[in-house]
Amino acid sequence: LPVESNSIDVAAQNCLFNIFTAEDLHQALKEMYRVLKPHGRLVLSDPICDMDMPEALKNDERLRALCLSGAIPLNDYIDMITSVGFGTVEIRAKRPYRILSPKHYPGAQENIIIESVEVCAIKDPMPQDGPCVFTGKSAIYFGEYELFDDRQGHTLLQNQPLAICDKTAHNLKALQNENIYISESSFFYDGGGCC
């Protein structure tokens, strides 16, 4: 892009990255990372799917024009975003979008569920233990004390939900503390959490 490095606060795209090949998507994400200021945000909205797209559908130009053939699994999508350096990824929303059924798409061996995902990738420094990915998980402490401190920077107040990243959810769950509830991913996140 003919844009200076570290010069943009927010960049956004809607369904554009889904029409790229994996190599082109990686290059586009690298460029977005380059032009964003530190703590700048890349807001994305793309179709994703829960499985690898069959080659016959991946190479279908009609589906590419519909922004469907480039859909990849959410974890792969997040990995592509974090592989260029984004230290924080927030899944803001995820909802059903389309179904590619074998009846209508002969290249599909089974129904392929396509979902629309809204993501905010933040140009934060990459934590030593990997990126902070927020998928809408929360932790609630309901023990006998006023709070629970995991000594890793997370303080859970008595009976107050706290938005946490998936990495923190995993670490809290590993404590096997029967007084801490960890929710499943809601795939809705509007900020205010900790990693």
Regions found by a protein language model. Name each.
Residues 1-11:
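A short acidic, Gly/Pro-enriched loop at the edge of an enzyme's catalytic core
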Residues 9-24:
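A short SAM/SAH-binding and catalytic strip from SAM-dependent methyltransferases
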Residues 15, 31-33, 81:
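Class I S-adenosylmethionine-dependent transferase superfamily signal
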Residues 16-17, 47-51, 93-98:
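Short "lid" loop at the C-terminus of a central beta-strand within the Rossmann-like core
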Residues 26-41:
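A short glycine-rich, Lys/Arg-flanked "PGG" loop and its adjoining helix->strand segment in the class I
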Residues 47-68:
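Short, glycine-/aromatic-enriched active-site segment of Class I SAM-dependent methyltransferases
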Residues 69-91:
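Short alpha-helix
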Residues 84-96, 100-195:
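C-terminal lobe and adjacent flexible extensions of AdoMet/dcAdoMet transferase-like proteins
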